[in-house]
């Protein structure tokens, strides 16, 4: 079965995404069970789920890394990426979306759209990924299908169109009405493999009629032929509805909504059918865009195995037995075992050792990967996340991925002297796998600092150090990852001259430094050769190294641009080293004049509390320097949305529990960096000294 060749039109590359605990991994497990990939269904709460293969995931019952799996259903090849729902791991979601063609969002029928669903949905909007929604846990207490559909419209502004209605809810959930075919499916056994297709139950006919009309109106909006038929009262066939639905989904105009209970095995096969019917194949999406490495001109590559190779390494993982795996999406062309590919980001040729198709943590070796495939490559030494692999005769650089800055850091030290080197190697490997995890040495204290997206993120990193790399370490208290930036446009000089017998050192440069919104930029505006070309990168390096430790409190400096406009050199004494030091001196001089300020991470916080505690909770948020953005009622509770500095949120869970007698809960995620008030800045500087 697995070795059969599938045409591209029969490929589906989809992601499964959701808020934590909406039942995403369970749904993926059921899909693998029905498509014949696993013989025993894994349960998350037993710690046996196939997709969750890192030990930490099985213990915590959450998904941390997105596993990529290939399975087969009704003569189609479906590649599934299971993405984490915890806010600390948005990077995994971001990179999965970059390589998917479509996504299934899973909601908990009791809660509808939750904050992390919104985050993931916005990320999917950025990549224009067509989506469908599976409302899960219909068997749970408080399950409400129509409320959940309502939250899709209100909170995500999605054109949510139910294709199904549940028959019963909670314990009485027994089947599903199919509005497209206008019939019903009743489940007869616990495994969901025995089901009866019957007529719609009498007591639901009226409701089904009403929702089928809404479905027809939605497809008529995207298809003129159906619009004409609908207005003239003609019968519209099931095939016509499906064709129009597919068209609406691909254009991001319709979001089909299905329902079920993955845990009770209800609705999963219908979900698989819908993935095949409505999700895009690699041929349906736009040709992938990129740039020519030398000229920078825009190019595109079609989804065609005969076209030149263009592939994106979207995730690096380290396997204890085979070393480094590069998970890759092939957009065009073919990649063969044992051949060379060109990494256009690094400008290096790399040899492919072996090619794999992945099934959670089992692998199948293959001879080649073609356009549309998702697979893993073994043997690439220099490739990191976001790199493009192509033919050196036909180079292209695909659009890279952008990752957020880490917001929280802790100091870490090995328990033994011997562990120091081991820890350094392990941290470098982990940083290579995860672009939102950074590690650096604090220049003032000499401590090793690790930084990430949240406490859970760093906990899991430390856990992996102990388990995978056998490094025992002591970890400090979590600290806020402050940053520094500049507010003024200034000019500054850096001059490094040393004459002390023998060959001297000479480096001299003038720079302009200015604030920007985006990443660090370096512009070389030298004319007339006042500094030779070969020394320019050294100045850039000197500035970048110096920017790791700002002048206010030694935090990394962000959001600035440097323009190198003048300088001088010495025929004999100038060297790269001298210019690197001159660059760092110019940076420090510029910073001291540029009105430097401290920045802190501001978090987007959502608190759900019963109405009677609202006053207390809002008062507490204000006392934490929070800015209330708005409030919305939700089923007997209020949702308070606010921006609060991360430094004020440590220990918030305990406070919220005591203020609401355990009935309040909250989620937060990083939103942006903003300036720290002067009084707080002085306090932070005092604590650093």
Curated annotation (Swiss-Prot):
**Gene3D superfamilies noted in UniProt:** 3.30.230.10, 3.30.70.240, Elongation Factor G (Translational Gtpase), domain 3, P-loop containing nucleotide triphosphate hydrolases, Translation factors
Q: Where does GTP bind?
A: 18-25, 82-86, 136-139
**Cellular location of this protein?**
Cytoplasm
* Domain tr-type G span(s) in chain numbering: 9-283
Q: Which GO terms describe its cellular component?
A: cytoplasm
Record keywords, A-Z: Cytoplasm, Elongation factor, GTP-binding, Nucleotide-binding, Protein biosynthesis
Q: What does this protein do?
A: Catalyzes the GTP-dependent ribosomal translocation step during translation elongation. During this step, the ribosome changes from the pre-translocational (PRE) to the post-translocational (POST) state as the newly formed A-site-bound peptidyl-tRNA and P-site-bound deacylated tRNA move to the P and E sites, respectively. Catalyzes the coordinated movement of the two tRNA molecules, the mRNA and conformational changes in the ribosome.
- Specify the protein name: Elongation factor G
GO biological process terms on file: ribosome disassembly
**What HAMAP family is this protein classified in?**
EF_G_EF_2_B
Q: Which CDD domains match?
A: EF-G, EFG_III, EFG_mtEFG1_IV, EFG_mtEFG_C, EFG_mtEFG_II
In the record, the note on similarity to other proteins reads: Belongs to the TRAFAC class translation factor GTPase superfamily. Classic translation factor GTPase family. EF-G/EF-2 subfamily.
Alphabetized GO MF terms? GTP binding; GTPase activity; translation elongation factor activity
